[in-house]
């Protein structure tokens, strides 16, 4: 029992930096949702059901261009297929004694970042570690989108358009430091 609590707590702690990063990215997606005509709560609902910036960005582009819901669903499914593979890779590192329900619960919130910290854990990993990380990271994602959507409805367009470049700035902030250290 103590091991389970410790695993969950470690997941919570390891999920905090992920939640902060998610907040920044999803904030811009919330603003972008408003730009294509969604209310803040619609953008937040999209984030609550789709924990991927690529999937949401594609969905927003399809909505903006007047695409059909079939196109939106197919695009999102194709973009998110990688999570099926990530979930399968994580189950290999689980104890064979883990119940199917825990395995499925663990797979619901797999994202690139949560997969990364989970797969780095020693074998066998605990589903509670993954669930702990999801418990803080996923609400950070949804909250960021909701607040971005609210701010997008309040702030003037000139401000929101400048905030929408934050997503690109974050990618540069992630890429540039390692690129400086690992010159090829």
Predicted segments, located by residue:
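Alpha-helical membrane-protein architecture signal
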Residues: 5-9, 128, 132, 168
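Alpha-helical transmembrane segments of multipass membrane proteins
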Residues: 27-31, 48, 58-59, 117, ...
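Membrane-helix interface "capping/anchor" motifs
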Residues: 176-184
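Loop-to-transmembrane-helix entry motif
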Residues: 11, 15-19, 158, 162, ...
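Helix-loop-helix junctions within the multi-pass membrane cores of secondary transporters/permeases
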Residues: 73-164
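Helix-loop-helix hairpins and the membrane-proximal interhelical loops
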Residues: 1-50, 61-76
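Small-residue-rich segments of transmembrane alpha-helices in multi-pass membrane proteins
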Residues: 22, 49-55, 107-111, 140-142, ...
């Amino acid at each position: 029992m103590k091991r389970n609590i410790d695993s969950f707590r470690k997941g919570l702690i390891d999920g905090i930096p992920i939640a902060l990063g998610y907040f920044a990215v999803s904030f811009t997606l919330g603003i972008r949702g408003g730009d294509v005509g969604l209310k803040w709560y619609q953008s937040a609902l999209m984030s609550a059901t789709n924990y991927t910036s690529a999937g949401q960005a594609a969905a927003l582009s399809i909505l903006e261009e007047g695409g059909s819901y079939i196109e939106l669903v197919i695009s999102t499914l194709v973009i998110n297929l990688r999570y099926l593979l990530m979930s399968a890779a994580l189950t290999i590192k689980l104890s064979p004694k883990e119940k199917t329900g825990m395995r499925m619960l663990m797979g619901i919130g797999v994202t690139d970042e949560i997969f990364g910290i989970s797969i780095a854990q020693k074998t066998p990993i605990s589903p509670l570690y993954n669930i702990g990380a999801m418990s803080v990271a996923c609400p950070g994602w949804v909250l960021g989108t909701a607040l971005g959507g609210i701010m997008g409805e309040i702030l003037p367009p000139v401000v929101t358009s400048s905030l929408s470049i934050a997503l690109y700035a974050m990618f540069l902030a992630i890429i540039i430091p390692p690129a400086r250290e690992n010159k090829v």
